[in-house]
Amino acid sequence: RFALLLLSALSSVHARQAVSAQPHAACRLRGGAKDERTYAMMKPDVCSNRKAEADIKRLIEEAGLTIVREERCRLSKAECEEFYAEHSERPFFPGLVAFMSSGDVIKLELQGENAVRRWRELIGPTDSEKARKEASSSIRALYGTDNQRNAAHGSDSPESAARELALMFD
Protein backbone atom coordinates (compact mmCIF):
# COMPACT_ATOMS: atom_id res chain seq x y z
CA ARG A 1 0.00 0.00 0.00
CA PHE A 2 2.87 2.40 0.83
CA ALA A 3 4.49 1.65 -2.54
CA LEU A 4 1.25 2.54 -4.36
CA LEU A 5 0.93 5.79 -2.42
CA LEU A 6 4.55 6.71 -3.16
CA LEU A 7 4.17 5.86 -6.86
CA SER A 8 1.02 7.98 -7.07
CA ALA A 9 2.76 10.97 -5.44
CA LEU A 10 5.79 10.67 -7.73
CA SER A 11 3.60 10.46 -10.83
CA SER A 12 1.81 13.63 -9.78
CA VAL A 13 5.10 15.50 -9.27
CA HIS A 14 6.46 14.38 -12.66
CA ALA A 15 3.24 15.39 -14.40
CA ARG A 16 3.42 18.91 -12.87
CA GLN A 17 7.08 19.24 -13.88
CA ALA A 18 6.33 18.18 -17.45
CA VAL A 19 3.50 20.71 -17.75
CA SER A 20 5.48 23.56 -16.18
CA ALA A 21 8.50 22.87 -18.42
CA GLN A 22 6.50 23.35 -21.60
CA PRO A 23 6.74 26.80 -23.22
CA HIS A 24 3.60 28.89 -23.19
CA ALA A 25 2.49 32.18 -24.66
CA ALA A 26 0.37 34.06 -22.16
CA CYS A 27 -1.63 32.80 -19.21
CA ARG A 28 -4.28 34.87 -17.46
CA LEU A 29 -3.61 35.79 -13.86
CA ARG A 30 -5.93 37.25 -11.25
CA GLY A 31 -7.44 40.55 -12.34
CA GLY A 32 -6.94 39.78 -16.05
CA ALA A 33 -3.17 40.43 -16.05
CA LYS A 34 -1.09 38.29 -18.40
CA ASP A 35 1.93 36.21 -17.46
CA GLU A 36 3.92 36.34 -20.66
CA ARG A 37 7.40 36.07 -22.11
CA THR A 38 9.33 38.62 -24.09
CA TYR A 39 12.63 38.89 -25.91
CA ALA A 40 15.23 41.32 -24.60
CA MET A 41 18.73 41.97 -25.82
CA MET A 42 21.61 43.94 -24.36
CA LYS A 43 23.47 45.52 -27.26
CA PRO A 44 27.26 45.66 -27.87
CA ASP A 45 27.61 49.11 -26.28
CA VAL A 46 26.45 47.66 -22.94
CA CYS A 47 28.13 44.26 -23.26
CA SER A 48 31.56 45.88 -23.13
CA ASN A 49 30.72 47.13 -19.61
CA ARG A 50 30.28 44.38 -16.97
CA LYS A 51 28.92 46.83 -14.39
CA ALA A 52 26.22 48.02 -16.81
CA GLU A 53 25.29 44.38 -17.53
CA ALA A 54 24.94 43.65 -13.82
CA ASP A 55 22.95 46.85 -13.24
CA ILE A 56 20.52 45.98 -16.04
CA LYS A 57 20.00 42.45 -14.70
CA ARG A 58 19.31 43.93 -11.26
CA LEU A 59 16.78 46.37 -12.77
CA ILE A 60 15.07 43.46 -14.55
CA GLU A 61 14.71 41.55 -11.29
CA GLU A 62 13.59 44.64 -9.36
CA ALA A 63 10.87 45.15 -11.98
CA GLY A 64 9.50 41.70 -11.11
CA LEU A 65 10.64 40.04 -14.34
CA THR A 66 12.44 36.69 -14.37
CA ILE A 67 15.33 35.87 -16.68
CA VAL A 68 14.29 32.48 -18.08
CA ARG A 69 17.10 32.11 -20.62
CA GLU A 70 20.32 34.03 -21.16
CA GLU A 71 23.01 33.68 -23.79
CA ARG A 72 26.05 35.83 -24.55
CA CYS A 73 27.14 35.62 -28.17
CA ARG A 74 28.36 37.61 -31.15
CA LEU A 75 25.76 37.85 -33.92
CA SER A 76 26.88 37.47 -37.51
CA LYS A 77 25.92 40.10 -40.09
CA ALA A 78 23.50 37.57 -41.61
CA GLU A 79 21.82 36.99 -38.23
CA CYS A 80 21.48 40.75 -37.71
CA GLU A 81 20.04 41.21 -41.20
CA GLU A 82 17.46 38.50 -40.51
CA PHE A 83 16.59 39.86 -37.07
CA TYR A 84 16.16 43.44 -38.30
CA ALA A 85 14.71 42.50 -41.73
CA GLU A 86 11.67 44.78 -41.21
CA HIS A 87 14.09 47.75 -41.38
CA SER A 88 16.02 46.56 -44.45
CA GLU A 89 14.81 49.43 -46.67
CA ARG A 90 15.54 52.13 -44.08
CA PRO A 91 18.65 54.29 -44.48
CA PHE A 92 19.98 53.35 -41.02
CA PHE A 93 19.90 49.58 -41.74
CA PRO A 94 23.57 49.09 -42.85
CA GLY A 95 24.85 50.97 -39.79
CA LEU A 96 22.54 49.04 -37.48
CA VAL A 97 23.75 45.69 -38.87
CA ALA A 98 27.39 46.79 -38.59
CA PHE A 99 26.90 47.95 -34.99
CA MET A 100 24.94 44.90 -33.86
CA SER A 101 27.56 42.52 -35.29
CA SER A 102 30.50 44.53 -33.88
CA GLY A 103 30.62 42.87 -30.47
CA ASP A 104 28.90 40.59 -28.00
CA VAL A 105 25.21 40.84 -27.21
CA ILE A 106 23.28 39.21 -24.39
CA LYS A 107 20.07 37.54 -25.50
CA LEU A 108 17.42 37.22 -22.78
CA GLU A 109 14.05 35.60 -22.46
CA LEU A 110 12.11 37.42 -19.76
CA GLN A 111 8.94 36.22 -18.09
CA GLY A 112 6.44 37.98 -15.89
CA GLU A 113 3.13 39.74 -15.67
CA ASN A 114 2.70 41.87 -18.83
CA ALA A 115 6.39 41.26 -19.60
CA VAL A 116 6.36 42.90 -23.06
CA ARG A 117 4.93 46.18 -21.78
CA ARG A 118 6.98 46.21 -18.57
CA TRP A 119 10.29 45.57 -20.36
CA ARG A 120 9.50 48.31 -22.91
CA GLU A 121 8.77 50.73 -20.06
CA LEU A 122 12.00 49.73 -18.32
CA ILE A 123 14.16 50.38 -21.40
CA GLY A 124 12.42 53.65 -22.30
CA PRO A 125 12.19 55.51 -25.63
CA THR A 126 14.34 54.27 -28.53
CA ASP A 127 16.34 57.51 -28.76
CA SER A 128 18.58 57.78 -25.70
CA GLU A 129 18.47 61.61 -25.77
CA LYS A 130 14.67 61.51 -25.69
CA ALA A 131 14.85 58.87 -22.94
CA ARG A 132 17.00 61.17 -20.79
CA LYS A 133 14.32 63.87 -21.07
CA GLU A 134 11.19 61.71 -20.75
CA ALA A 135 12.28 58.66 -18.73
CA SER A 136 15.48 59.61 -16.92
CA SER A 137 15.73 56.37 -14.93
CA SER A 138 15.21 54.10 -17.96
CA ILE A 139 17.93 51.77 -19.24
CA ARG A 140 18.36 53.74 -22.47
CA ALA A 141 18.63 57.03 -20.56
CA LEU A 142 21.23 55.59 -18.20
CA TYR A 143 23.33 53.50 -20.61
CA GLY A 144 22.51 54.55 -24.18
CA THR A 145 24.21 57.25 -26.21
CA ASP A 146 21.96 57.77 -29.23
CA ASN A 147 19.19 56.27 -31.36
CA GLN A 148 21.25 53.21 -32.37
CA ARG A 149 23.67 52.71 -29.48
CA ASN A 150 20.78 52.67 -27.07
CA ALA A 151 21.79 49.79 -24.78
CA ALA A 152 18.86 47.42 -25.26
CA HIS A 153 16.27 45.94 -27.58
CA GLY A 154 12.76 44.96 -26.56
CA SER A 155 9.98 43.21 -28.47
CA ASP A 156 7.15 45.63 -29.24
CA SER A 157 4.27 43.13 -28.99
CA PRO A 158 3.55 39.58 -27.82
CA GLU A 159 3.57 38.49 -31.49
CA SER A 160 7.00 40.05 -32.08
CA ALA A 161 8.23 38.47 -28.85
CA ALA A 162 7.17 34.99 -30.02
CA ARG A 163 8.87 35.51 -33.40
CA GLU A 164 12.06 36.94 -31.90
CA LEU A 165 12.32 34.28 -29.19
CA ALA A 166 11.98 31.54 -31.81
CA LEU A 167 14.52 33.22 -34.09
CA MET A 168 17.12 33.89 -31.41
CA PHE A 169 16.82 30.80 -29.19
CA ASP A 170 15.46 27.91 -31.29
Please describe what each predicted stretch is.
Residues 1-21:
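N-terminal chloroplast transit peptides
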